[in-house]
């Protein structure tokens, strides 16, 4: 498999992974927004999950950007 096609395939994989993680993060995000709107203290576990998923999304996006730069340089 050529380098370009391998990079394109890996970029698509990253995009799918980001969508999947964002879907998981939305549950804790909803709980956090609800707590804010009700002026309550957010659940610590929801905060931890939100931060965990946000970190994973950021890492995956950064990796995808590196792959795109590499693809453009070919």
Model-flagged regions — what are they?
Residues 1-23, 55:
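Short, charge/polar-rich alpha-helical segments
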Residues 8, 25, 56-58, 62, ...:
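Intrinsically disordered and other compositionally biased segments
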Residues 12-16, 35, 69:
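Compositionally biased intrinsically disordered low-complexity regions
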Residues 17-51:
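Short E/K-rich amphipathic alpha-helical oligomerization segments
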Residues 34, 61-74:
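Long amphipathic alpha-helical coiled-coil segments
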Residues 54-57, 67:
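Generic alpha-helical secondary structure signal
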